[in-house]
């Protein structure tokens, strides 16, 4: 229905302890980066979940990307919001659909982020483990994101699952 779509069009800060909670300061920083014609790659991890986001000004100017690692042992958003395990994928889909800048989120896997920088690109690989409670565990290395380091900071592959043999 139209009223449901209208509700989704309303933009409001959803995490006041992140970029959207510091609107004025963020816009000053983004404006400075735009004037200097600099693109940034921000590494984060305090949310304890894996994310990949575009960093864009209120005018839609892309100034960089943010790559966030999950925690290894601390709970993340899924725990704080009491999201049932069977609904996590639906929440992840909703987040990436409703939060325009968000390219990827993983609300339940624990692990770390490995980032490789070259003069041409940034390669981000999320490494997840299925448990930290046992000496034996399964490693999941299927999520990655690449960004070309040119003036547009163009993603060369949207967040994808790596093909495994």
For each feature predicted by the language model, list its residue ranges.
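Long, structured stretches of catalytic cores involved in phosphate-ester chemistry, encompassing
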Residues: 1-165
